[in-house]
Amino acid sequence: VTEILIALMSGPQDGALLTFETFLDSGKPAEITFGRREDCDVCLSYDSQVSREHAVLTYDGETFWLEDLHSTNGTYVGEEKITGRTAIAPGQLFRVGRTWLRIEPLPTMLGSDDDLPF
């Protein structure tokens, strides 16, 4: 089991930390959907700039991939609008509608204590 943490960085849920458990041993990459629909994993119904099914974040065990699902207002990594599937690193900001989000690095992604400078 791997946990993926998504931090909401703006809007009425600013500061919320969402946890998703993934079972990568099933052979299927983990997927987290973003949109206004209640059945999306991250429901952003308060943001009128978010499409019903706006974007999907996929984790294949090594890389996070963000993909816009033909939304009206686009999906951005930083200030750059993405087209197609785009690799995104933990800690990097991305925007769905007007809502900024971030993938939080997991302790296993930070490396061992030997990598620390102190």
Language-model segments: what does each one mean?
Residues 48-52:
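Short coil-to-beta-strand transition motifs
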Residues 37, 76, 99:
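Gly/Ser/Thr-rich beta-alpha loop segments that engage phosphate groups in nucleotides
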Residues 1-47, 58, 95, 108-118:
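Intrinsically disordered, low-complexity acidic Ser/Thr-rich regulatory segments
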Residues 42, 53-93:
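Forkhead-associated
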Residues 100-102, 107-108:
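Short, charged beta-turn/beta-strand-edge "cap" motif at the junction between a beta-strand
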